Structures are given as C-alpha cells and as structure tokens.
Amino acid sequence: MNIAELLNQNPTPSDVALIDRSKKPAPEVSVAEITNQVHVFAQAMVDLGLTPGSRIGLLAGNLGEYYTVMFGAPAAGMVFVPLNTRLPESTLQYIIQDADLKLLITDVSHAEFSADVPKVVIGSEQWGEMMGGAPASNTMDVEPDDVAIQIYTSGSTGKPKGVLLSHENVTFTVLEYGAALPGEVMLVSAPLYHKNASMASKLAFASGGKVVLLPQFSPGEYLDAITEHRVTMCSGVPTMYALVTAELQKAPDRHDLSSVQRVLIGSAPLTEALFDDVQALFPKALVTNGYGTTEAVLEFGPHPEDLPRPKISLGCEHPSVQLKLVDPDTGAESDRGELWVKSKGVMLGYHGLLEANAERLTDGWYHTGDLMHRDEDGWYFFVGRVDDMFVCAGENIYPDSVEQMLERHPSVHQAVVVPVRDELKGQLPTAFIRSEAGVQMSADDIKEYALKNGPAYAHPRHVWFVDEIPLASTAKIDRTQLIKNAEKLLNLDTEVQ
C-alpha cells in the first residue's frame, strides 16, 4: 500500500479532518479535500519531469500544506524528505546534498533559504500555478519496501543520518493502531518534521479522527485549542507540560480541559512525580509514557492479559513486534539490556551508511541504543541511553538512573547528570538541578542525598542549580551542551553552591 492510500481508509472522508490554526481564521478541511490536493501535487511533480524515487524536501513549519507534500510526494512514487527547521544552515545544506534533493519546498518564513536545487515557496505564484492543475488519476503503485520517507536524525553526535522508511514501515504502524482512534480529536503542536507529530496526523486521517494543528507550541495556544475544539487526545514532552501547568495557574478558570481522554508523554525520561503532575493537569485522562524511535516506528502495546499498566512503564511487547534485551557487553539476552526490535516497522537502513547499518541492524533486528528493564509481568521500563553511559573509576554509570534517584528528592524538580573528564578516575558525574519553586538548596544537600540513596561512585561530585535545561533541536535534553557548560564552569571554578 502506498502511504497516500492511507487517506482512502478514512470512513468519513467528507467530515472535517483538519483544523489548521496556522491561519486566521483557522480553515476546516476534510480528508476528501486533502486527498484532492495530494493528487494535484503528485501530478505537478510528474509535470515537472521528476521521476519515481526522486527526493522532495520540505523546509517548513506546521501548516496545512505540509500534508499536501507529506502525502503528495509518495503518491507520485517519490520520496518525502522533511527538514528540521531548527538545524543550522550548514547542517541543512549537508542534508540537501546527502539526500540529492531534486526539489525543495519551503514556507514563506524560509523563502530566502538558498539551496543549489530548484525551490518552490508555498503561497507563491509558482505554488499557486502548480496547485491549480488537474489531480493525478491514481496513486503510484509501489512495492512494500520502496522508500517513502527519508527522515534525518538530529546529528547531535555527528552528521545527521538519513533514515529510510518504506511504505510498509509506515502503513504497518498506522493500520495496527488506527482502529482504536475513530472520533479522536488530536492536538498536534510538535513540529511535523518529527515522527510523533506526523504519525499522529496519519493515524487521525486514516481512522476518521480530527487533527487540530498548531503552527508551533505555546502554552497559551495549547490550552486555548483544547478548550475551543474539545480536544480528546494530546501528546508532548515533559517540558511542554511544565509550561502548560504554569500557564494554567495564571488563569485556572479560563480553560476547560475536561474533554481530554488520552495524554501521551514522550521524547524524554518520565518520572513518577512528573506523571502525577500531568495526571493532575488532565484528571479524566489516561496518561501514558510513550516511546518510539524513528528507525522502528512501533514497539510497545498493552499487556496481553490486560494487567494495569505501571505509571512509567513503556508498555509490553506489541503482538506484531518482536523485542529482546541484549547485554551490550556480552551479547547475551536478559531482563536488562539494550532494546532490539524486529517488525515490519523497522527501517530499511541508513542512507548510504554501510558501517552504521552493520552496527544497528542484525538479521532484521534494530539495535535501539536504549537500555531497558523488563519486569516479571513483561512490562518494559526505560533505564537510559547506552551511548550516555560513562565510566567512573571502572564503574558504569547510566545518567538516567542517577537522575531518577535525584528526582525523588522532594525539592528537586528536574535533574540532569553528565560526565566531566578527570585525570584520576577518567570521568566524574556532575549534576544540573532545577529546584522546586521557592526552595533553597545547596550542592551539599544533593550530594548527601545521592550518597544515602545510591551507590557512592555515582553521586555527583559537582552540582549547579539552573533555571532551565537546554534542549536540542529534537526537544530532548542537550547533554552535549551541558557537558560543555560543566567543563567551562569547572575551568572557571564557578560552581554554584
């Protein structure tokens, strides 16, 4: 099945499926209208002389036309390449060259972006002419393993890698999950170049749900959208919900969140304290800890015997997916180790990177790089990134484990642990702490708590208190920047007590 044919799965194509709040007033669009625009775009690509397999890039924020390109390129048998608008220009230029783009589509805010490929700006006269033509008569026939999407990693630890997702990779996930979502009103505020936002949209359009699309996240707009459109399902990262909570406290009677039935938290480790905060924000909702990788799309599902889900569990092995935990050092399977995934959702590989493919793919198994624990009931829990692990005096330290311990302190709102170089022990753990509002703490308070509640070798040797934690372009904690900050602070001998 072609990705674009997911639109044909919608049981009520004439009903409103998209409320596009990137425009004022927000237009309401049906799947039938989206489908027509998708086929017009597909035919326009053919008329431009582009052939199946050609890479079509999109550098844009959230707007309704995003879906035209997202579905339209694959509808013509071409490959959709979403570009992260938060990446520096040099990185974007690298991606454009690496992907060998044949056409770049941008929104107005990126109209001045210079690239050595043909470019069309959404809303321009050229775009209008292109979208004023006749629709393609049909969707291009594809093989299950034909590439549909080439989405790039953030490149936080090197050059971005192009993840090759086939039509089957994506349609498999949508068809597995979509049956449970008819009638849902989904709030999409994360960038559509991220997997979670684009996948949520595909699920809604295929199942008969509705997408309320925000141009970008802002806590006030987020709350307004929930209230105005009676949103039933939303997702976000922990920092988003912290901002939403603060915004709600300014005018608690202005917003009605009672319509929300499902809340998914993802892209960062979840503590029980944060879980409780989000549950208090949406008291009628089922709050779940979400997990997903760009490379594997689908991993977890409910318990096969319908056991109640522990607060911060990621779920159990999905019935259409194989999971195993592999010890990174010995290669043996156990109840604690690196998560490996095998399913129809696992990527074809990284574009042009044979060495990376050999490291991450083994006989169809994708090595996620995420350390997990599985309990006796089959529930999986996130422990940390294998790559984030560091060694202090011969002892392996997983930052997430130390952070979870520190965040159990009643005065700690958020903790991030990173290593710094040390001549004697190799690396030492350090911590950046966000305290609860109005609380005064000292570095010694944190160190003493860590020594009492965890192994001595893992306690942070240096502690700094900060107002906010830097985020990378993926909205995840920017550990690389924090390591630089820690080393700078130590070199200047400016540890904050």
How would you name each of these model-derived features?
Residues 206, 231-236, 249-309, 322:
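Gly/Ser/Thr-rich phosphate-binding loop
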Residues 171-185, 193-233, 247:
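Conserved AMP-binding/adenylation subdomain of ANL enzymes
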Residues 17-63, 67, 71, 88-93, ...:
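Conserved AMP-binding/adenylate-forming core of the ANL superfamily
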Residues 12-16, 134-152, 159, 180-185:
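Conserved pre-ATP/AMP-binding loop-to-beta segment of ANL
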Residues 455-476, 495-497:
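AMP-binding/adenylate-forming catalytic domain of the ANL superfamily
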Residues 28-32, 148-172:
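Conserved AMP-binding A3 loop
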Residues 87, 104, 234, 343, ...:
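AMP-binding/adenylate-forming catalytic core of the ANL superfamily
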Residues 34-41, 144, 163-183, 189, ...:
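Conserved structural elements of the adenylate-forming
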